[in-house]
């Protein structure tokens, strides 16, 4: 069995406890306008362009048959959706400025990468985190990878939107030690507007997890996106929903990530902000926490 993997990040300290290896799987059913990993949204393998590697030799344009690569305003642009001989273009690029955004990997191939970090997992309950994209979109591969990790005694975690059938989640639960579940927007209207899908399935899955013995595995997360998720109404709305199920749930408020903007240049897409916002200050993060407290939650984690 193989899966579509767009990155494996070693020595990660932001995707769970301790030192972790984070495996990023391609494909996501959500289309969040602020997506932190836009290269992982499409399930298809697509070309990406690294401008900092480019020597502007224009070999890619010469090898392009269907204008998949063009020059506009003295800048190289790629058009990933065009039917193009991408493998030839990539092979001819002398600096690796154009590359594919992912590769097919077997469970064993991924495990070979994971084992390189295994000796570090003993410090601080480290292990493997499967992220994306949305790993539940490739749930069969995710399940086999989790099983392989557990066979080797490796702590496992998943970062997920929970936008999947409940039966899929049940398939993975026996092999998960930690579940980081995104709850981005409280209202159906806002969720449809900013992510393109309803939040009802997500809310139902959160309820299922928090009403069973699995609730201690769960940390609910909300990324703070200016003018979208980082509002009093939204944070209080999420907190009230969670409080109505399990008031002691762990709820993490994630700071805005300004580094995501650079990834949009790789795939030749516009970012949702004309001017990239800055990180929220500690004072602002504490205010977000206070709004969650007003909504009835007690166990709140702030990412500064």
Where do the PLM segments sit?
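Auxiliary Fe-S-binding modules of radical SAM enzymes
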Residues: 2-17, 215, 226-304
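N-terminal pre-triad scaffold of radical SAM enzymes
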Residues: 5-59, 76-85
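N-terminal-biased segments
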Residues: 16-17, 24, 42, 46-51, ...
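Iron-sulfur cluster-binding cysteine motifs and their immediate structural context
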Residues: 33-40, 59-77, 87-103
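Conserved dinucleotide-binding and phosphotransfer motif residues
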Residues: 96, 148-152, 295
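Conserved AdoMet/S-adenosylmethionine-binding subsite of the radical SAM
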Residues: 108-266
């Amino acid at each position: 069995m193989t899966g579509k993997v767009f990155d494996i990040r070693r020595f990660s300290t932001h995707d769970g406890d301790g030192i972790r290896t984070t495996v990023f799987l391609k494909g996501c059913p959500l289309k969040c306008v602020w997506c932190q990993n836009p290269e992982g949204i499409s399930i298809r393998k697509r070309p990406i362009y690294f401008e900092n590697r480019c020597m502007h030799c224009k070999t890619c344009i010469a090898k392009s048959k269907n204008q998949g690569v063009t020059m506009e305003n003295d800048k190289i642009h790629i058009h990933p959706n065009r039917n193009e001989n991408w493998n030839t273009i990539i092979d001819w690029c002398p600096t690796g400025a154009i590359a594919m955004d992912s590769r097919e990997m077997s469970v064993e191939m991924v495990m070979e990468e994971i084992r390189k970090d295994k000796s570090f997992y003993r410090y601080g309950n480290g292990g493997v985190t499967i992220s994306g994209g949305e790993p539940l979109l490739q749930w069969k591969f995710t399940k086999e990878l989790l099983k392989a990790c557990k066979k080797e005694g490796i702590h496992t975690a998943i970062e997920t939107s929970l936008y999947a059938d409940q039966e899929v989640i049940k398939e993975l639960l026996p092999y998960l030690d930690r579940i980081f579940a995104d709850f981005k927007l409280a209202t159906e209207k806002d969720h449809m507007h900013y992510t393109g899908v309803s939040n009802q399935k997500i809310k139902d899955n959160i309820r299922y997890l928090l009403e069973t013995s699995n609730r201690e595995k769960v940390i609910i997360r909300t990324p703070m996106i200016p003018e979208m998720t980082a509002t009093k109404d939204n944070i209080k709305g999420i907190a009230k929903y969670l409080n109505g199920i399990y008031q002691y749930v762990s709820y993490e408020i994630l700071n805005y990530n300004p580094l995501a903007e650079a990834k949009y240049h790789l795939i030749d897409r516009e970012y949702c902000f004309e001017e990239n916002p800055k990180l929220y200050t500690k004072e602002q993060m504490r205010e977000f926490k206070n709004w969650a407290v007003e909504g009835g939650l007690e166990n709140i984690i702030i990412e500064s």
